[in-house]
Amino acid sequence: MQNQCVLTGQVVAIEPVRHTPGGVPRQRLWLEHRSRQEQAGVARAVEARIALILAGDTAIGSAAQVREGSQIQVSGFIARAGHRGEAQDRLELHVQALVHLD
């Protein structure tokens, strides 16, 4: 099954690095995406805000120069934010590659 997503946008928030119980560093950034897409032959304005999850030293290192307001492109996979409550209904993008655009 396919689960791959590529988004560009502006970083609007950066949360502190935390560690999982297993000691893996993990950081959440918030990306705001705006674009025009075509759907059913009609141009449509698209706006979305999504949490980006960076896990591991390499991923967090790739975001070391990212600041609020930075334009970036990310690729990765979509997963639910958690297993209980409202988190089951929220999606996060788990980043596998990050490119600075500015």
Regions found by a protein language model. Name each.
Residues M1-D102:
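Single-stranded nucleic acid-binding surfaces, predominantly the OB-fold ssDNA-binding core
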